[in-house]
Regions:
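Short, solvent-exposed loop/turn segments that connect beta-strands within catalytic domains
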Residues: 66, 111-115, 142
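Short, conserved beta-strand element in jelly-roll/cupin
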Residues: 72, 77-82, 90-110, 149-152
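A short, N-terminal "cap"/entry segment at the start of jelly-roll beta-barrel domains
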Residues: 1-71, 164-178
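Short beta-strand His + acidic residue motifs that chelate non-heme Fe in jelly-roll/DSBH
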Residues: 86-89, 106-108, 128, 134-140, ...
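Conserved short histidine dyad/triad with adjacent acidic residue
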Residues: 56-63, 74-91, 130
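A structural connector/turn signal
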Residues: 75, 85, 94, 115, ...
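A short hydrophobic beta-strand segment most commonly corresponding to one strand
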Residues: 96-98, 127, 141-160
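Short acidic-glycine-tyrosine-enriched beta hairpin
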Residues: 110-130
Length: 178
């Protein structure tokens, strides 16, 4: 006999192992590439696809029923082609970029515009603290796949450093609702 030393959350207190596996396993083959996950993804140079696994990440698409319900963090896989990336932004929580395949240039930036680029390869990562302006670009010759984790189950949408993008940061959600 084995003993669970911690209680299950109320919503799965009486669930079978099969029910738990059905709700808490996510497979890449079942993920849909979302090329409109973020407002800046409409802009050339920022086009990328989010594959949501746990929660919505910084996309704000919290109604996605095809994801594992988030408890303490989110997890997505990003696909970024050469020459693309994302706009400089902040979050209210830590964000991690962990490269799986390919090469990525992550950056951190201060409010004066000073920027430091960090080249990342497979199995390398950067943890971006809350409130620190950051982002990435794929300046290599091949696509890159990397994990993105945010340290909260329902983080706010991206806090773009650019004023116009920030003003429209939720517009992609309104378009999805139509």
């Amino acid at each position: 006999m084995t003993t669970a030393r911690h209680p299950r959350p109320p919503e799965i207190a009486n669930a079978s192992l099969e029910e738990i596996a059905a709700r808490y396993v996510a497979r890449y083959r079942d993920r849909k590439a979302d090329w409109a996950a973020f407002e800046d993804a409409k802009v050339e140079g920022y086009k990328r696809a989010q594959h949501r696994f746990i929660g919505a990440g910084g996309s704000g698409k919290h109604a996605d029923v095809n994801v594992v319900p988030p408890r303490g963090f989110t997890l997505s896989i990003m696909y970024v082609e050469p020459g693309q990336g994302n706009a400089a932004h902040t979050h209210e929580v830590e964000e991690v970029f962990f490269v799986l395949q390919g090469y990525l240039t992550a950056f951190i930036q201060d409010e004066s515009g000073r920027r430091i680029d960090i080249k990342l390869g497979p199995w390398e990562c950067i943890a971006c603290p809350p409130g620190v302006i950051h982002g990435y670009v794929n300046d290599s010759l091949e696509p890159v796949y990397f994990q993105v984790m945010l340290g909260k189950p329902r983080p706010d949408t991206m806090g773009y450093a650019d004023e116009e993008l920030y003003r429209r940061r939720d517009a992609h959600l309104k378009e999805d609702a139509r």
